[in-house]
Amino acid sequence: MIQISNLILAADVSPEVAGSSGFNMIASFFAAALLIVIPAAAFLIFVSQKDSLERTSATRRR
């Protein structure tokens, strides 16, 4: 932890900029989850349920 703070001080980065950058990084993780991960998971669950229903109905026809 001391090495990171020394690096920030040596790079002449203000604490406000470092805090803002950290906040934006975390916000981008949440945005990625909302825009990519959640819709992809919902789609995969939908396809999986649909496939399960098709296999169940195909088994009953035999």
UniProtKB/Swiss-Prot annotation:
Membrane-spanning segments: 26-46
Superkingdom of the organism of origin: Bacteria
Listed GO biological process terms: photosynthesis
Cellular compartments annotated: Cellular thylakoid membrane
Topology term for the membrane: Single-pass membrane protein
Predominant cellular place of this UniProt entry's protein: membrane
InterPro entries: PSII_PsbX, PSII_PsbX_type_2_subfam
Keyword tags: Membrane, Photosynthesis, Photosystem II, Thylakoid, Transmembrane, Transmembrane helix
Gene Ontology cellular-component terms listed: photosystem II; plasma membrane-derived thylakoid membrane
Function description: Involved in the binding and/or turnover of quinones at the Q(B) site of Photosystem II.
Assembly with partners or alone: PSII consists of a core antenna complex that captures photons, and an electron transfer chain that converts photonic excitation into a charge separation. PSII forms dimeric complexes.
Family to which the UniProt record says this protein belongs: Belongs to the PsbX family. Type 2 subfamily.
Protein name: Photosystem II reaction center X protein
Organism (species): Prochlorococcus marinus subsp. pastoris (strain CCMP1986 / NIES-2087 / MED4)
Source species taxonomy: Bacteria, Bacillati, Cyanobacteriota, Cyanophyceae, Synechococcales
